[in-house]
Amino acid sequence: MAFNFNWSPLMADASFYTRAQDLLTAALNKSPKPPIIVDDIIVTELNLGSIPPELEILEIGDLAEDRFRGIFKMSYSGDAFLTLKTRVQANPLNTYLLTRPSFATPRPLAAATPLTIPLQITLSDFKLSGFVILVFSKQKGITVVFRNDPLESLKVSSTFDSIPFVRDFLQKEIEAQLRILFMDELPAIIHRLSLRLWVPEYRAGEELQTQTASANGEGPGQDPLASPPQDPVDALGNALNESEIESLSLDSSVETHSLFSQKNLLRLAALTDSQRTLSLFTPSIREVVYRAWTSPSDQTDASGSVTSPFFPVLSRTQSQVGSMSSFPDSASMVSSQSRSSTPSHTFSGYGLSLGAGRHSKAHARKRKKRVVDLRRPKTTDDAPSVSDESSFTESTSAPSICSAPLPVLDEQTDDPVTPPLSPDNDLHLPAIPERHRMSISRPALRRENASEMIRDTAECKPSSNAVGQAIQEEDLSATPRAAVRAHGASVLEKGKQDPDSSAGSSRQLPSTILPFINDNPTGGVVDQALVERLAGEIARRMRDEKFMASNACGPFWDRHSQEESPPPAYGH
């Protein structure tokens, strides 16, 4: 059985070639193009030649008047040619950088400048050989499937034939693309062409789609920037009038796209300058973080701090290294909030500050809420045992309220509770580490000395009524101490009227010499001998504390091992 192919009608039909060119153009641009090709591939010329292909029938599966199915062996070596036109990238470095990740490639300035060159390629001298499965039907058209790669060779002619490496590169790339074309795209192209020839419904549908596409594409394109703004300026920022705007066109040298609004340009320039200089008058923009802050409160809010500038901190701090030495009375200061009994040690400028008793001062940065109770205290039964906790304290900050919740002492009803206020005229003395030793190791000795001094006070009589103010005595010792003030005769009168409460009166000694309490001008007169006796007793205690300086810097637990008596809180 032999077949005779009439190849001449295919060469004469012009519409067939036009349709085939469109299908080939769509097929060549559908697949991923190599990076060297930077434009669409357009088929400008197509010619199937005058030599038909050679077909050898290997198998016929179905044969009828309107259908056919068979397997052929095809060989072609004819004069068909194909001409393509596109644009290529002539700079290989630009192509290399585009195909590599940005973090792994260098950043040349001028070497990677793109250079596109138009390219025309002609494909000829096709040599095909392969097995083809051919299925024909008048209702479904022709289906051609290649079982193997039919392309053996072809000739590629281009405008770069004089450059050997460019010619070889194009030859290799085009062959790779044509192999994909024959295996994937060519069967679809042949099937669509056969439907156009033998199926009228398909032809009518394609014509309708073509008319719709042409109707949508009619009319010139509208340029959104064709209408100039209300206050246009040229590229140099000079304002233009209406006559100059009318003389301009899209085809002139001065484009209308450059006519921007002068008002908007000024706003953009001001915004750019303010952002560059971090000005505080930067226009507010939504979802923008500014590096310049208008006030410190903005920084506090931005940093997420919970500290509010409207709520003052209750703890008072002092910048001096050592504050005033004092004898605070636990009966005149009441704390509304008990502190933790766990000893927390704070390092001062001269050594380890242990505070008063076992309850040391908390960390300086910790905010404390202190409340001074100005109400009259209530009488309690255990008042005589509480005043033993009065001690000599040294701290690196201002005098604070007692470090533990204490009961209230029994005092006169006409004697108000005075809050601890720091006087301005008192002497600020440096902190002495030895005094912390005495505040822990010798509480019993302080109680005995206080009892002896108050008993001597009760035996003495006032010698004169002319002295109405406190007498301050200087100590011959080098150790500094606080000023001693004379309170009124209320303590003496209280000792005479209530002999049963002599123990309670004896424990009010720190209240009489507390420097925070103002002098009472209407009180009695303290004898000069009493003041000298008190000053001598204080000087003797200071000298005793000074002799124990060798053990002041020792470990904290060694100090407890050397205690002569238990602390005030556990002495009874």
From Swiss-Prot:
<dbReference type="InterPro" id="IPR031468">
    <property type="entry name" value="SMP_LBD"/>
</dbReference>
<dbReference type="GO" id="GO:0008289">
    <property type="term" value="F:lipid binding"/>
</dbReference>
<comment type="subunit">
    <text>Component of the ER-mitochondria encounter structure (ERMES) or MDM complex, composed of mmm1, mdm10, mdm12 and mdm34.</text>
</comment>
<feature type="compositionally biased region" description="Basic and acidic residues">
    <location>
        <begin position="371"/>
        <end position="381"/>
    </location>
</feature>
<comment type="similarity">
    <text>Belongs to the MDM34 family.</text>
</comment>
<keyword id="KW-0812">Transmembrane</keyword>
<dbReference type="GO" id="GO:0015914">
    <property type="term" value="P:phospholipid transport"/>
</dbReference>
<comment type="function">
    <text>Component of the ERMES/MDM complex, which serves as a molecular tether to connect the endoplasmic reticulum (ER) and mitochondria. Components of this complex are involved in the control of mitochondrial shape and protein biogenesis, and function in nonvesicular lipid trafficking between the ER and mitochondria. Mdm34 is required for the interaction of the ER-resident membrane protein mmm1 and the outer mitochondrial membrane-resident beta-barrel protein mdm10.</text>
</comment>
<feature type="compositionally biased region" description="Polar residues">
    <location>
        <begin position="500"/>
        <end position="511"/>
    </location>
</feature>
<keyword id="KW-0446">Lipid-binding</keyword>
<feature type="region of interest" description="Disordered">
    <location>
        <begin position="321"/>
        <end position="426"/>
    </location>
</feature>
<dbReference type="GO" id="GO:0000002">
    <property type="term" value="P:mitochondrial genome maintenance"/>
</dbReference>
<keyword id="KW-1134">Transmembrane beta strand</keyword>
<feature type="region of interest" description="Disordered">
    <location>
        <begin position="477"/>
        <end position="522"/>
    </location>
</feature>
<feature type="region of interest" description="Disordered">
    <location>
        <begin position="212"/>
        <end position="236"/>
    </location>
</feature>
<protein>
    <recommendedName>
        <fullName>Mitochondrial distribution and morphology protein 34</fullName>
    </recommendedName>
</protein>
<keyword id="KW-0496">Mitochondrion</keyword>
<keyword id="KW-1000">Mitochondrion outer membrane</keyword>
<keyword id="KW-0445">Lipid transport</keyword>
<feature type="compositionally biased region" description="Polar residues">
    <location>
        <begin position="387"/>
        <end position="400"/>
    </location>
</feature>
<dbReference type="GO" id="GO:0032865">
    <property type="term" value="C:ERMES complex"/>
</dbReference>
<feature type="region of interest" description="Disordered">
    <location>
        <begin position="553"/>
        <end position="572"/>
    </location>
</feature>
<feature type="compositionally biased region" description="Low complexity">
    <location>
        <begin position="330"/>
        <end position="348"/>
    </location>
</feature>
<feature type="domain" description="SMP-LTD">
    <location>
        <begin position="1"/>
        <end position="195"/>
    </location>
</feature>
<dbReference type="InterPro" id="IPR027536">
    <property type="entry name" value="Mdm34"/>
</dbReference>
<keyword id="KW-0472">Membrane</keyword>
<keyword id="KW-0813">Transport</keyword>
<dbReference type="GO" id="GO:1990456">
    <property type="term" value="P:mitochondrion-endoplasmic reticulum membrane tethering"/>
</dbReference>
<feature type="compositionally biased region" description="Basic residues">
    <location>
        <begin position="358"/>
        <end position="370"/>
    </location>
</feature>
